[in-house]
């Protein structure tokens, strides 16, 4: 029975150590380039502007005018 407690303690300590080794977080820098109906492919438009963006996505914001969907480009930085 004592060896099970020892093994579980070792696993808990090891997992806590791994938490400190993992980087804090990965943040995405974004720039919105226009409404989605203006671009046929938001992903291709973001990669095509050659500012180092990794991907693009149509994002829905609060409904303002007619089209709430905006094409936003993202760049992942560690």
Swiss-Prot record:
Q: What are the annotated GO cellular component locations?
A: extracellular region
- Localisation: Secreted
A Pfam family in this protein?
A: AtDEF-like
Where does the signal sequence lie?
Answer: 1-28
Residue stretches in coiled coil: none
Primary localisation category = secreted
Q: Which UniProt keywords apply?
A: Antimicrobial, Disulfide bond, Fungicide, Plant defense, Secreted, Signal
* Annotated disulfide bonds: 32-73, 36-58, 42-71, 46-72
Gene Ontology process terms (BP): defense response to fungus; killing of cells of another organism
Family assignment from sequence similarity: Belongs to the DEFL family.
- Spell out the protein name for this chain: Defensin-like protein 74
To which species is this protein native?
A: Arabidopsis thaliana (Mouse-ear cress)
């Amino acid at each position: 029975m004592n060896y099970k407690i020892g093994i579980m303690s070792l696993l808990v300590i090891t997992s806590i150590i791994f938490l400190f080794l993992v980087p804090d977080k990965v943040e995405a820098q974004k720039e919105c380039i226009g409404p989605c109906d203006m671009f046929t492919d938001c992903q291709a438009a973001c990669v095509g502007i050659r500012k180092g963006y990794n991907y693009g996505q149509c994002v829905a914001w609060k409904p303002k005018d007619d089209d709430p969907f905006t094409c936003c480009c993202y760049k992942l930085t560690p």
